[in-house]
Amino acid sequence: MQRGAVLLGVVALLVLWPQAGAELYDVNDPDVRAMVIDGQKLMHDCAIANDYIDDPWWTLNLGAFEEKRVYHSMLSELVFCLNAFLQRRQQAP
């Protein structure tokens, strides 16, 4: 079930990637806010699925994402997390 949720999140991320990379980034915009919150939830779910001990992104409030750089850092780490998840599942018997 977790695998399906993570894969669904990957699909959603790929579909919404152009929106995430847009030049205008205002965390008060409802669409941007939704992307940040959903990305944060997906990162948290991926951390749980990979049995990570600590997920620093989950503890950040919305104000911490006012800088686009912070959001892009989280997305970059999410890609590594999802790759680790998929590699681990491929190696499982």
From Swiss-Prot:
Main location: secreted
Gene Ontology molecular function: toxin activity
Entry GO terms, CC: extracellular region
Propeptide: 23-33
Keyword Signal: yes
Keywords from the UniProt entry: Disulfide bond, Secreted, Signal, Toxin
Tissue-specific expression: Expressed by the venom duct.
Residues of the signal peptide: 1-22
Subcellular compartments: Secreted
UniProt PTM: Contains 4 disulfide bonds.
Superkingdom to which the source organism belongs: Eukaryota
Domain remark from Swiss-Prot or TrEMBL: The cysteine framework is C-C.
Protein family according to the UniProt entry: Belongs to the F superfamily.
The protein, known as: Conotoxin Mr105
Species for this entry: Conus marmoreus
